Amino acid sequence: MRLWGGRFAGGPAEALARLSISVQFDWRLAPYDLLASKSHARVLHRAGLLDADELAAMLAALDELSDAVAQGRFRPTVEDEDVHTALERGLLERLGTLGGKLRAGRSRNDQVATDLRLYLRDSAREVAARLTELSHALVVLAEQHVDTPAPGMTHLQHAQPISFGHQLLAHVQAFVRDIDRLRDWDVRASVSALGAGALAGSSLPLDPQGVAAELGFDRAFANSLDAVSDRDFAAEFLFVAALIGVHLSRLGEEIVLWTTREFGWVELDDAFATGSSIMPQKKNPDVAELARGKSGRLIGDLTGFLATLKGLPLAYDRDLQEDKEPVFDAVDTLLLVLPALTGTVATMRVRRERLVAAAPDGFALATDVAEYLVRRGVPFRQAHEAVGQFVSWCVAHDVDLDEVSDDDLGMINPLLTPDVREVLSVRGALEARSAPGGTAPDRVREQIAALRPVLDRDQAWAVG
């Protein structure tokens, strides 16, 4: 079935038909198209274009068609060009010529723009719900390891001791920002395009604002041409999805490192690890690696989508058929990765003894010595130089900072007196970072207390 044809003497060539068909991927928009159709039927009734009996019959047929779609009893055929064509066929099969009245005042251009917004607004909430679940899992693990010291790293080199809980919460902060972006995105996406027609609006007495309210949008379009041309909402969603992917990749990379024999900080549950087809001893962090790998796919969805939009003249162009697959792929990818990564985090076992042993490695307390000298009135540049000499001497003699004798301290630099030993403690180093947002255990507990209501708020938005 086609929604056009009177202008043409014959049907499209088979090659064109194969190229044009999109129902194999846009069928997932069917529930949203049917929802919008019910609102459009009601506005046609208010406009005097459907009488009360016709409206009742129309709504009953749309309800029955919705049930048939949901139960798989109605499916598109190879003759259906797209989701709109298939559903109109289903309506005509149920209502005959009355079903054709629903087309009045409506174009596939404003239909698809509205359907895609409805789909993405639901999908954004589903992604946010899965993100809050991952964040909750990280918070629970962080709470268990508020007092567990770990090597804090820069350039993947030992830098300063931190609370392992503090490191886990850093990932939560990124995910909270991602959810904030989804909520902020939703404000701009909450615009209905129904009533815009093909591009110029309609000469029929439609009610775009009323339809928008019925469909849960905050407002109707301000410019009919922009309404059918605009795909900013999809591009912006794809950016947020790509950034979520980047954040998942960074967490995945750390889990990969933590599970290596060289680090040995974390043991994965068997349910979230795989083996090797040839090496019997292997236990591979596939979930974390796939989270890392899928981020490239999400970035590709965004860049491919933007390339499609570049240079398009206003109103609908057939290029926009290509807008849906990257959007659908991004949603599917996130909803595939997030539960698996949540399960990985929720079940992995932290090897606390390995973290405690590694925390002071690599002269990680050197900064504490420098800051101790600063508190005694030594200019930081001089303190930095003295402690650099201290570390250099320890490297040359293969000893740690706390293994240097009093005599050797003075020989290395006169500023290094025996009382510097007071700060050569991992526990003291953690406690000393007590400024707001720091890694001191009390501050980490404050972070957890502050995050819980934020995540509860985000979960409420996601399911509301």
UniProtKB/Swiss-Prot annotation:
One of its GO terms (cellular component) is cytosol. It catalyses: 2-(N(omega)-L-arginino)succinate = fumarate + L-arginine. Pfam families: ASL_C2 (PF14698), Lyase_1 (PF00206). Belongs to the lyase 1 family. Argininosuccinate lyase subfamily. NCBIfam families: argH. It is an enzyme of class 4 (lyase). Its EC number is 4.3.2.1. SUPFAM superfamilies: L-aspartase-like. PANTHER family: ARGININOSUCCINATE LYASE. Pathway: Amino-acid biosynthesis; L-arginine biosynthesis; L-arginine from L-ornithine and carbamoyl phosphate: step 3/3. It is found in: Cytoplasm. Gene3D superfamilies: Fumarase/aspartase (C-terminal domain), Fumarase/aspartase (Central domain), Fumarase/aspartase (N-terminal domain). InterPro entries: Arg_succ_lyase_C, Argininosuccinate_lyase, Fumarase/histidase_N, Fumarate_lyase_CS, Fumarate_lyase_fam, Fumarate_lyase_N, L-Aspartase-like. It comes from Frankia casuarinae (strain DSM 45818 / CECT 9043 / HFP020203 / CcI3). This is Argininosuccinate lyase. One of its GO terms (molecular function) is argininosuccinate lyase activity. One of its GO terms (biological process) is arginine biosynthetic process via ornithine. Keywords: Amino-acid biosynthesis, Arginine biosynthesis, Cytoplasm, Lyase.
